[in-house]
């Protein structure tokens, strides 16, 4: 803006001039009120400010046409005295600089208007605030809209009012043109007034904001300079466009226009040293006073230049200005190259300041020198020629670190996009020799410094250079990315607009072809997004120059590698984005499905989880609350009514006052309403009472059930525990009994009785669980596995005692000629838990087999004096298969056949007293008891087969088993007769009661397993077989009665000899010797039967 400095004596001019000034000021105030109508978000001037303005109008001779100030009202309310201090301290500020001085001199206190050229005489009516500060003029901190005072203008500037179209980003608004536009600040004020929530004057004064005007004749956009020739071009229906070269610093939407956010770019902010001093804005130091408007920036002492938190000074803002003024003409007060400050950030080096040269044609490239510098600065490479200047007291502001970090990230993304386009462009070119262009306007740019605009045919499109108007190293032209457009066309190469002026004269206006500008926003917004890379330029037919680059193979390969990396990165980013979207959709679907499942579960289980009683309880609670609230309201109304009635009654009685009918009617109305409420509540109470009673009864039942549960549950658990113990004892007893019965007693089978071979019906019950097969079976080579867990536990307890008893029994075993046959037969059959070889370790086949279960096998000897028993042939008998669950399942539904032949002991496989050499004189008397007893024993044995059949495996097929059963049936028919005779002999011997000699008993004992105490066990009423026929001679009472029909195990076990037993026996209740009664129950045999009976077993149960 043009500035006229006036001397002090001019202030005392004629009063007519002063009166005309007053008139003009009044007109200006009326017009300004018109301009201020829609600016509700800006502060209004105070009375003090208006008074100051009037005094300032009287104190000047010439009308002051226009100056610019900031939003100062809010700050002026806080610090009204700071403005005077700021103005007085201006000349003491180190920022009062002169561009032509070689150094900054803070001692320069006096302003000498050197260098005042003829441009100062353009308009005699302009006065600066610096002049008013020197003359003691105070404006009182009035907030001004920067619009000119509407008054009678100069004849040269007179123009009619009109409209102007203002465009900012994607918005377009109309504004009323003022009578005159004296400076570009007026245009900025138009923008601020049209966009109050987006723009501020401080932001528009920044170095990154430009205003362009549209030239419809050339379809160009020229940059609007702060010169009269440019400002006169703003006519009716002109289009003005605001362009931001760095959109990240654009202020956001302002709430009410008061709380102005700080821009993100480095701002001109004084530090603590100069906050108390006023300083001029950036344009005052960057131009050469050809067209300068010095104005004070009325900012608060504690509020920075951009209202917000404290920030540092912009880089190099007050550095050496000699370089910026060497070449003469400066295009704009906002544009001067500046060295970087101490906290230099290379990412902002090309965005923080603007070039000191004019930008006649907005070019994509930035010039031959500045492009290289800026590109190096973009990648963090400091240029050697740029020496950082440290301002005197510049302080680092940590509050901007987060914003700086975000901007750095955005700029890095932009660099990636630029690099991608650069590589793509370089690779699409043909490596040819560069064209030698003699024209100085042809811009030949190294390929590695060019922006990414590759053409379709592989050529590089360059445009004219901007004229070199004294460009120095720290100057740069406006980049193409700072352009704006109204056109819908794709951005391409702008048409060349050659300047018609030389570098000596005034420079041409900056122009932008409107077809090359983006439609709604600057290119900066698009460049902030890394993907996709910049689009290649579209080839346009005219005004293009072709130049080619010669690339070395290494550079070409590097560019190819960079292109590949960029493509990979782009693909990866695209893949990651797709994966993220897919995962987001999947997560949303999962959350939705989970919610639906939870909801369905709650709805389905609402009757069980919450229960119907809960709904009833909720309803009752709500009704009870409503009832209580109504009762409280009723009581309050009644209390108020009673107090009112009592007060009225007292006044009537005591003061003899008249009764007001209206008051009585009101009280009657309240009483009527209360009576109706009482009646309604009385009707509702029984229902509520019944519901609450039902609820209480239900809760009481629930409580009683819970108490009964808490009381009875311990007893129930104890009872269950006792039952478990009882069942455990019973099962142990039955297991031992099954171990005894599974020895397959040879039971004679009478042809007339079917029950001797028919199994009990109870064992064919379908509810009986089929036992699992035994865990181990005997093999011919050795290794025996325990039958089940209980056997294994009991076996571990008596392993040592069993081995000692085995060796002790071997010493007393008599020679037997039939042991080989019986042992071989047993080994071939493999039907029990232990083989015959365990009992006779002299056999080489089974001598190494460990002793697990000790069994006694029947012996064929009667007494010591009996004649030798002939052996019966056993070679015709097939091996007996083991019984298991599979076999049991086959025979459960059919008649169980007789068991296989018994395993015999050392005397003879089937030797008995009924052999041909034994006298048969008692045979006719033994026809009842043994048949019944042993038939039941066979029945129990078959029962035992059903219960313990899971321990053996099948060793032969069904045909062999059928043959064995037939042979066994025949043998049993014969044995039945033999047993009858034997029983008669036993009866005769019991009558005689002949005791046996203990010496012969001990001599003929056959000890198997832990049978060392068998003479003591004879008090258990065992029926001994084999060579143990004399064991009972010295043991208990021989006349102990035996009742086969007792149905239970005799309780005199362990009482015949004081209860002496081996540790391997089952204790007092071990059933070492049992007999089966006629009714199938277990009973103990009398001891005198043990002297002659051959087929009774002694078994040591582990």
Swiss-Prot record:
GO cellular component, one term: cytoplasm
Keyword annotations from UniProtKB, A to Z: Coiled coil
One of the Pfam families matching this protein, by short name: AIP3
Compositionally biased spans, kind Pro residues: 867-881
Positions in coiled-coil regions: 405-430, 554-579, 614-654
Biased segments, Low complexity type: 12-21, 904-918
Biased composition (Polar residues): 832-849, 936-958
Region (Disordered): 1-69, 295-318, 450-475, 489-539, 745-774, 832-958, 1031-1087
Compositionally skewed regions (Basic and acidic residues) per UniProt: 1-11, 50-65
PANTHER family: COILED-COIL DOMAIN-CONTAINING PROTEIN CG32809 (PTHR22741:SF10), P140CAP/SNIP-RELATED (PTHR22741)
Name under which the protein is recorded: Coiled-coil domain-containing protein AGAP005037
Provenance organism: Anopheles gambiae
Organism placement in taxonomy: Eukaryota, Metazoa, Ecdysozoa, Arthropoda, Hexapoda
């Amino acid at each position: 803006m043009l500035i006229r400095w006036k001397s002090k004596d001019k202030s005392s001019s004629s009063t007519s001039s002063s009166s005309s000034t007053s008139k003009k000021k009044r007109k200006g105030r009326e017009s300004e009120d018109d301009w201020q109508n829609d600016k509700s978000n800006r502060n209004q001037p105070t009375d003090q400010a208006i008074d100051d303005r009037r005094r300032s109008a009287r104190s000047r001779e010439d009308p002051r046409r226009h100056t610019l100030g900031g939003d100062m009202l809010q700050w002026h309310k806080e610090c009204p005295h700071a403005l005077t201090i700021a103005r007085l301290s201006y000349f003491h500020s180190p920022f009062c600089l002169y561009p032509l001085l070689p150094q900054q001199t803070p001692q320069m206190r006096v302003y000498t208007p050197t260098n005042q050229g003829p441009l100062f005489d353009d308009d005699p009516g302009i006065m600066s605030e610096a002049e008013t500060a020197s003359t003691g003029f105070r404006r009182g901190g009035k907030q001004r809209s920067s619009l000119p005072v509407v008054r009678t203008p100069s004849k040269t500037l007179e123009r009619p009012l009109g409209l102007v179209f203002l465009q900012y980003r994607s918005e377009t608004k109309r504004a009323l043109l003022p009578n005159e536009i004296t400076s570009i600040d007026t245009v900025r004020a138009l923008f601020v007034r049209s966009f109050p929530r987006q723009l501020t004057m401080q932001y528009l004064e920044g170095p990154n904001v430009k205003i362009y005007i549209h030239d419809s004749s050339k379809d160009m956009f020229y940059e609007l300079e702060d010169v009269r020739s440019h400002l006169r071009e703003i006519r009716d229906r002109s289009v003005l466009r605001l362009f931001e070269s760095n959109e990240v610093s654009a202020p956001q939407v302002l709430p009410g226009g008061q709380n102005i956010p700080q821009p993100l770019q480095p701002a001109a902010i004084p530090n603590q040293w100069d906050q108390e001093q006023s300083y001029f804005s950036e344009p005052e130091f960057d131009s050469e006073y050809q067209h300068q408007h010095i104005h004070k920036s009325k900012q608060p002492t504690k509020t920075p230049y951009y209202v917000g938190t404290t920030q540092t000074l912009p880089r190099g803002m007050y550095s050496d200005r000699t370089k910026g003024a060497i070449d003469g003409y400066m295009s704009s007060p906002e544009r001067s190259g500046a060295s970087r400050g101490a906290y230099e950030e290379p990412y902002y080096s090309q965005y923080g300041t603007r070039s000191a040269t004019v930008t006649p044609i907005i070019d994509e490239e930035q010039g031959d020198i500045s492009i290289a510098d800026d590109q190096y600065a973009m990648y963090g490479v400091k240029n050697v020629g740029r020496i950082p200047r440290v301002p005197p007291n510049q302080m680092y502001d940590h509050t901007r670190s987060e914003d700086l970090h975000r901007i750095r990230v955005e700029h890095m993304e932009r660099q990636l996009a630029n690099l991608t386009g650069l590589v793509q462009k370089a690779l699409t070119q043909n490596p040819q020799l560069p064209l030698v262009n003699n024209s100085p306007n042809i811009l030949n740019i190294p390929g590695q410094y060019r922006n990414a605009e590759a053409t379709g045919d592989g050529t590089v499109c360059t445009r004219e250079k901007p004229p070199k108007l004294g460009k120095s190293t720290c100057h740069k032209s406006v980049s193409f990315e700072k352009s704006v457009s109204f056109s819908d066309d794709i951005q391409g190469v702008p048409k060349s607009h050659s300047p018609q002026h030389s570098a000596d004269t005034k420079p041409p206006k900056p122009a932008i072809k409107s077809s090359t500008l983006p439609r709604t926003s600057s290119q900066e917004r698009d460049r902030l997004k890394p993907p996709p890379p910049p689009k290649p330029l579209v080839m346009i037919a005219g005004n293009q120059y072709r130049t080619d680059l010669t690339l070395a193979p290494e550079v070409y390969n590097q560019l190819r590698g960079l292109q590949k990396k960029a493509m990979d990165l782009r693909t990866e980013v695209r893949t990651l984005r797709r994966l993220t979207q897919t995962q987001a959709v999947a997560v949303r679907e999962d959350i939705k499905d989970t919610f639906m499942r939870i909801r369905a579960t709650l709805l389905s289980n609402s009757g069980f989880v919450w229960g119907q009683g809960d709904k009833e309880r909720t309803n009752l609670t709500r009704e009870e609350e409503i009832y209580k609230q109504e009762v409280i309201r009723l009581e309050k109304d009644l209390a108020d009514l009673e107090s009112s009635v009592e007060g009225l009654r007292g006044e009537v009685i005591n003061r003899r006052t008249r009764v007001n009918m209206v008051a009585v009617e009101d009280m009657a109305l309240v009483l009527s309403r209360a009576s109706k409420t009482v009646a309604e509540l009385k009707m509702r109470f029984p229902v509520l009472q019944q519901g609450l009673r039902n609820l209480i009864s239900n809760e009481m039942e629930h409580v009683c059930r819970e108490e009964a549960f808490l009381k009875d549950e311990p007893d129930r658990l104890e009872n269950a525990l006792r039952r478990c113990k009882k069942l455990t004892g019973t099962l142990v007893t039955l297991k031992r009994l099954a171990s005894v019965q599974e020895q397959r007693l040879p039971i004679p089978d009478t042809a007339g009785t079917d029950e001797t071979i028919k199994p009990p019906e109870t064992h064919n019950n379908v509810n009986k669980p089929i036992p699992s097969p035994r865990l181990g079976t005997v093999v011919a080579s050795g290794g025996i596995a325990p039958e089940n867990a209980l056997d294994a536990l009991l076996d571990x307890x008596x392993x040592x005692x069993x081995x000692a008893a085995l060796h002790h029994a071997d010493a007393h075993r008599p020679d037997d000629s039939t042991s080989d046959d019986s042992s071989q037969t047993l080994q071939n059959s493999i039907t029990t838990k232990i083989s015959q070889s365990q009992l006779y370790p002299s056999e080489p086949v089974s001598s190494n087999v460990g002793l697990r279960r000790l069994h006694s096998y029947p012996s064929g000897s009667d007494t010591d004096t009996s004649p030798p028993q002939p052996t019966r042939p056993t070679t015709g008998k097939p091996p007996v298969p083991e019984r298991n669950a599979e076999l049991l399942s086959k025979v459960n539904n059919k008649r169980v056949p007789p068991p296989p032949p018994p395993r015999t002991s050392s005397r003879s496989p089937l030797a008995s007293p009924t052999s041909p050499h034994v006298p048969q004189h008692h045979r006719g008397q033994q026809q009842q008891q043994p048949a019944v007893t042993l038939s039941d024993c066979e029945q129990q044995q078959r029962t035992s087969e059903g219960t313990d059949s899971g321990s053996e495996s099948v060793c032969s097929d069904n045909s062999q088993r059928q043959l064995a059963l037939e042979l066994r049936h025949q043998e049993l028919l014969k044995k039945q007769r033999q047993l009858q005779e034997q029983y008669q002999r036993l009866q005769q011997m019991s009558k005689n009661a002949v005791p046996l000699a203990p010496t012969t008993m001990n001599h003929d004992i056959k000890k198997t397993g832990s049978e060392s105490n068998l003479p003591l066990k004879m008090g258990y009423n065992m029926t001994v077989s084999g060579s143990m026929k004399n064991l009972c001679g010295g043991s208990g009472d021989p006349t102990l009665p035996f009742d086969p029909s007792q149905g239970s195990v005799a309780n005199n076990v362990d009482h015949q000899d004081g209860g002496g037993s081996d540790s391997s026996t089952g204790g007092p209740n071990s059933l070492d010797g049992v007999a089966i009664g006629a009714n199938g129950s277990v009973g103990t045999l009398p001891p005198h039967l043990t002297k002659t009976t051959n087929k009774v077993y002694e078994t040591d149960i582990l």
